[in-house]
Each structure stands twice: as structure tokens, then as C-alpha cells.
């Protein structure tokens, strides 16, 4: 039952945002009583925490799947961007914005997990890019991976880039181009320019 609650809560939180969904909404959606809901979770914050980590785990698996299917690391970067953007809707309902604003402690916990899980994937992609001649062979993999993940954190920080002033899709695309241009070889640049051109046409 607890796993079913987390799965349903995760879906609703993604669709409507963490603040918007109440425990009453969750009980109704699951066709259970609030008493049953509170038997598994002491309060909404506990459920938000478990749901957030459930979603994060799903995102990591999705990124791993993309990584294994992508033809090369540049394609991987842009495919991951598209996958991640679905969690950034408008300012009122975006689960990421609401988590950062209303549950900053949980948001910080998730950020701490990023290095452990995503850092390994990023470093693997950088190594593949070097071995295939798309990324410069002299880049410092540890430095670049940390810089990349910190940059991704930065563009998602609503204190630095308020949603009312900055479009998340544009931020992602600008940052990806900034990151990739710093590490690609001439061969990689040709492929990168194709992806940028295709993105501009959409």
C-alpha cells in the first residue's frame, strides 16, 4: 500500500505541483481514507520527501536509458534536456519550483544526491566523448563534470533565474550550448551545430 501511495502521489505532484495537492486529494485519488493515508505517512512533508526521491530515482533510470540508446554523447545531452524539461512547467505548477520554494530542506537533500548518482553518468559520457573524438582529450573530467552539474543547479535556482523573467527551456538550451562548445573538438562542433540548428527550428 505504501508504495502505491508514493507512486500515485508522485504522479499528482508532477501534474499539479507539491503545494497544490492536498492529503484530501490524495485520499480521494487512491480511494482510501485519510486515516489510512496517515497510517503510512505522518504528514504531507514526509510523503513529499518520499515522492521526490521516487521521482528522482525514475529520472536517473530514464537518463541511464537515454545514455545507453544515444548514438553519441552530444545526442545524449540534448535528449536528456528534453526529458528533464517536462518537470519544469509554468511557475505555478512546476514541481521543481514548488519543491524549492515550499520544501527547501528536501530540495537540498536531492541536490546532495545529484553528485553521487548523476556525476558518475556525466563522467562516463565525457570519457566516451573523448574516446570517439567529439570532446577534447585534454579536458579535466572531474572538473568538467562538477562544473556541469553545478551549472545545471544554477539555472534551476529560482533565486538566480526567477521563472517570471527566464524561460526554463531557453536556459537549458543556452547552458547546453555554452557547456558543449567549451569541450568539443572540430568534429564534435559539426555535430553540435546540427543539434543547435534543429533546436532553433522547433
Predicted regions and their residues:
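C-terminal peripheral helix-coil segments that are non-catalytic and often amphipathic
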Residues: 124-128, 132, 165-202
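Short secondary-structure transition hinges
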Residues: 89-124, 131-135, 139, 143
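Short, basic, alpha-helical segments at the C-terminal edge of helix-turn-helix-like DNA-binding modules
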Residues: 52-60
Amino acid at each position: 500500500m505504501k508504495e502505491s501511495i508514493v507512486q500515485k502521489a508522485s504522479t499528482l505532484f508532477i501534474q499539479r505541483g507539491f503545494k497544490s495537492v492536498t492529503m484530501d486529494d490524495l485520499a480521494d485519488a487512491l480511494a482510501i481514507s485519510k486515516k489510512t493515508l496517515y497510517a503510512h505517512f505522518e504528514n504531507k512533508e514526509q510523503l513529499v520527501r518520499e515522492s521526490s526521491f521516487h521521482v528522482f530515482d525514475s529520472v536517473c533510470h530514464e537518463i541511464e536509458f537515454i545514455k545507453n540508446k544515444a548514438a553519441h554523447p552530444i545526442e545524449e545531452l540534448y535528449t536528456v534536456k528534453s526529458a528533464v524539461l517536462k518537470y519544469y512547467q509554468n511557475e505555478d505548477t512546476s514541481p521543481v519550483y514548488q519543491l524549492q520554494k515550499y520544501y527547501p530542506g528536501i530540495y537540498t537533500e536531492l541536490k546532495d544526491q545529484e553528485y553521487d548518482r548523476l556525476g558518475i553518468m556525466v563522467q562516463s559520457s565525457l570519457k566516451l566523448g573523448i574516446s570517439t573524438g567529439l570532446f577534447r582529450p585534454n579536458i579535466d573530467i572531474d572538473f568538467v563534470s562538477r562544473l556541469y552539474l553545478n551549472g545545471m543547479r544554477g539555472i534551476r535556482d529560482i533565486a538566480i533565474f526567477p521563472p517570471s523573467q527566464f524561460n526554463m527551456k531557453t536556459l537549458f538550451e543556452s547552458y547546453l550550448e555554452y557547456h558543449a562548445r567549451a569541450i568539443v573538438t572540430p568534429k564534435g562542433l559539426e555535430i553540435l551545430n546540427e543539434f543547435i540548428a534543429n533546436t532553433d527550428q522547433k
